[in-house]
Amino acid sequence: RAILAQLGPDGRLLALDRDPEAIAAGMQLQAADHRFSIRQSGFSRLHEVLAEHGCLGRVHGILLDIGVSSPQLDDPARGFSFRADGPLDMRMDPGSGQSAADWINAAGEKEIATVLWRYGEERASRRIAQAICTARSTEPVVRTGQLAGIIAGVVRGEPGRHAATRSFQAIRIYIN
């Protein structure tokens, strides 16, 4: 809305998002302001979407908001956060790709450790991966609280930071 407020009458704002809930909210704005369009798409398809809108070569700016949103973190049913127990999903678009639970329960210990290190800079990545594999050998890891508990059993959080922060970040990035 703030960007739209700064656009002139001939300006256009095109938004891309993979989250169906964000698309639904954006459709309301699209209906209210002809200068705004929203598409359910990943940023990897930006060139294609710009071509579809006749905008190639006519773009004056691009703003990428590539993080997880507060509504995603605040809704336990989305499975993004360790703050409240929910299904272990973490997908921006719950209708596509592999859920975090599916990946956690299928990936090898080395792959899990690599993801935790590469995307979360988790120093205890190997110990966490080993604990996840041990835990899932008796019961599949399917809940955010379950995964957070496994991680907290291996590492202590830093002051002001939950033990699972880095690992959850890494898994969210990898899944999406």
Show the residue positions of the predicted features.
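S-adenosyl-L-methionine-dependent methyltransferase catalytic core, i.e., the SAM/SAH-binding region
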Residues: 1-176
